[in-house]
């Protein structure tokens, strides 16, 4: 039996203290990790609701447990909104994460050891696009494509590899690429070899929803996404498709449940439904537009300060800084910036000579800072502070001054206070 009015603060002081410290960290640090964002209070409320108690294996109307009337209704709302938001004919809102959504797609359409063509992790792909340490690289034979010398996706290489290896699937999408993907050309290449085109739009789904980045659903057989990142919802996954291929839809559903998951997280699905509604508001497009403008302002500032931006530009929410000519590793840059309350992540650059644990670059994203109200002005300031620290990485005094500026700026743009 539990005490109904018990709170974390008066029951578990250790966990409560860490929760409060994390709250303060988010308020007092500038968050530039491209995959992180701040959810709304409505999304948080749904995730802390009584829906967390309900087990609901199966799909609406076909559950393995009773008492699912209301969670059925919630999941139907989430599905309807996801389809409307992305102009899809099919949506599965049950995946617990983007990685599980990707796993479900692979297992639905491929057999073990099938050949797959995906973007190299070191060139901007994701672990689930064929990394040898990930299930994708262990279960399937991945061939990797990358970027050309200008930093753009190398489509001639993709076509050459596709015709040489005849992959069962071509994977589009990325985790560290600042350009615009040519989904139409990828589909043309896939059709030339009778292959599936699967797109992972986890990083850019918010931009796609706002109509500011090409929608891959027009060309891909299947699309997955996370529901956080630019979409600004809870941490979770999503599978989408267009057309009327009922057989494909059934395969995808079966691959999620019972294929790789049991009971869905109904409190998270409710939060997804809310996030989808938020993404249909006019303000959401304004937000996404500012996300891009802030990223472009940061790229311009870094270039003006003598830093190399991979691809030389950005058309989305992120950019990759190449530090190979700055006598500093991505790992050290990450640590130095962290000491000044600026949060980035070390990231490999194309043809990186350093290990993924060290790297020659850092990845920077603008969804979170834009969510708290930063515009081009603040983005430019932050970029200059980053340069000040990295240009003087042995100067503790400069780092301390930047940290104070960060604290002052954060106080002007609170997240939840």
Swiss-Prot record:
UniProt cross-references to Pfam families, sorted A to Z: SHMT
Top-level taxon of the source organism: Bacteria
GO biological process assignments: glycine biosynthetic process from serine; tetrahydrofolate interconversion
EC number(s) given by UniProt: 2.1.2.1
Pathway where this protein functions: One-carbon metabolism; tetrahydrofolate interconversion; Amino-acid biosynthesis; glycine biosynthesis; glycine from L-serine: step 1/1
Catalyzed reaction equations: (6R)-5,10-methylene-5,6,7,8-tetrahydrofolate + glycine + H2O = (6S)-5,6,7,8-tetrahydrofolate + L-serine
Subcellular location: Cytoplasm
GO terms assigned for molecular function: glycine hydroxymethyltransferase activity; pyridoxal phosphate binding
Name of the protein described by the UniProt record: Serine hydroxymethyltransferase
Organism: Buchnera aphidicola subsp. Baizongia pistaciae (strain Bp)
């Amino acid at each position: 039996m539990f005490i109904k009015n018990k709170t974390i603060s008066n029951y578990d002081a250790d966990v409560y203290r860490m929760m409060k410290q994390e709250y303060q960290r988010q308020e007092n640090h500038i968050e530039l990790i491209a995959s992180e964002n701040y959810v709304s209070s409505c999304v948080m409320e749904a995730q802390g609701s009584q829906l967390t108690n309900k087990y609901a294996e199966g799909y609406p109307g076909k559950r393995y447990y009773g008492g699912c009337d209301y969670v059925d209704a919630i999941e139907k709302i989430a599905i309807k909104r996801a389809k409307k938001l992305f102009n899809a004919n099919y949506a599965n809102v049950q995946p617990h994460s983007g990685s599980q959504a990707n796993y479900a797609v692979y297992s639905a359409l491929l057999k073990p050891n099938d050949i797959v063509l995906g973007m190299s992790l070191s060139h901007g792909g994701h672990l689930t696009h064929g990394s040898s340490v990930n299930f994708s690289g262990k279960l399937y034979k991945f061939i990797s494509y990358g970027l050309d010398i200008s930093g753009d996706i190398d489509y001639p290489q993709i076509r050459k590899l596709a015709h040489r290896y005849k992959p069962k699937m071509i994977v589009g999408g990325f985790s560290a690429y600042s350009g615009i993907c040519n989904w139409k050309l990828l589909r043309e290449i896939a059709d030339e070899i009778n292959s599936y085109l699967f797109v992972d739009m986890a990083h850019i789904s918010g931009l796609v929803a706002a109509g500011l980045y090409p929608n891959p659903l027009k060309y891909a057989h299947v699309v997955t996404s996370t529901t956080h990142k630019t979409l600004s919802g809870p941490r979770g996954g999503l599978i989408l498709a267009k057309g009327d291929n009922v057989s494909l839809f059934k395969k995808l559903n079966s691959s999620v449940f019972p294929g790789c998951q049991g009971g869905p997280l109904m409190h998270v699905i409710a939060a997804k439904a809310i996030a989808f509604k938020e993404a249909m508001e006019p303000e959401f497009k304004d937000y996404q537009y500012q996300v891009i403008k802030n990223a472009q302002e940061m790229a311009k500032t870094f270039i003006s300060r003598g830093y190399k931006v991979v691809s030389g530009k950005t058309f989305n929410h992120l950019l990759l800084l190449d530090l190979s000519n700055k006598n500093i590793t991505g790992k050290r840059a990450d640590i130095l910036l962290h000491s000044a309350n600026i949060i980035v992540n070390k990231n490999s650059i194309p043809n990186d000579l350093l290990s993924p644990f060290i790297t020659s670059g850092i990845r920077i994203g603008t969804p979170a800072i834009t969510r708290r109200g930063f515009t081009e002005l603040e983005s430019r300031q932050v970029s200059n502070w980053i340069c000040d620290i990295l240009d003087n990485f042995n100067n503790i005094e400069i780092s301390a001054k930047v940290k104070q500026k960060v604290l002052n700026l954060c106080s002007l743009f609170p997240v939840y206070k």
